Amino acid sequence: MSFWEYIVDRRDLLVFLSAQQFSMVVQCLIVATVIAVVVAALVYRNNTAVGLATATSAVGLTLPSFALLGLLVAVTGFGITPAVIALTFYAILPILRNTVVGLATVDSSLVDAAQGMGMSRLRILTRVELPMAWPVVMAGVRVSGAMIMGVGAIAAYVGGAGLGGEIFAGLSRLGGANALNSTLAGTLGIALLALILDLLLLGVSRLTTARGIRV
């Protein structure tokens, strides 16, 4: 069976698995963005906390995904739970780093002007600092989206949803019928999903960034 025939024959399953993976990644990305922005907003004025947050992000990104998933499986068991926790954890790291950097590099004269107008700390954060840092934040979100789309494939090994199952199914019967087709379908499907997600996030970034600071 050719690769195209394999795709046509299993199109319903492949579409379902693609939708599963895309949904899982997007939901984890939304949760991670909220957590990362809140944490960054709490720590960005404290140099020690900023250093700790960026160091944690750097160290966290070095953790092998298989090792983290294995640890989570030991605690939560197989299934979607360890996959969601791992994806959310990895997604938080680039967003947290970028948000902290973005907030810390906002022009201090803008903050001083806002304070002179009598704005509260929270109002300055939401009306001045966060909008100015938003392009940097969204750059982190795009990095996280591409990264966890790939991690999501590995998460299928512990019972996570998505196209990773096709890859592992093909690898498990390497040399057998349709093994290569299965592996290629999963790999190319994930690459396509990552591209689609990045384009969507680019659109969201442009729509939510103030016109005056769009690049």
Regions found by a protein language model. Give the residues of each.
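Periplasmic/extracellular loop-to-transmembrane helix junction in inner-membrane transport proteins
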Residues: 1-29, 169-172, 176-177
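Loop-to-helix entry region at the N-terminal start of transmembrane alpha-helices
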Residues: 13-24, 73-94, 134, 182-186
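Generic alpha-helical transmembrane segments of integral inner-membrane proteins
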Residues: 22, 26, 30-38, 42, ...
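Transmembrane alpha-helices
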Residues: 26, 89, 121-155, 185
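Cytoplasmic-entry segments and transmembrane alpha-helices of multi-pass inner-membrane transporters
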Residues: 39-72, 87, 95-101
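Short cytoplasmic-facing helical segments at TM-TM junctions of multi-pass membrane proteins
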Residues: 98-138
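Hydrophobic alpha-helical transmembrane segments of polytopic membrane proteins
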Residues: 163-204
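Short cytosolic juxtamembrane segments of multi-pass membrane proteins
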Residues: 205-215
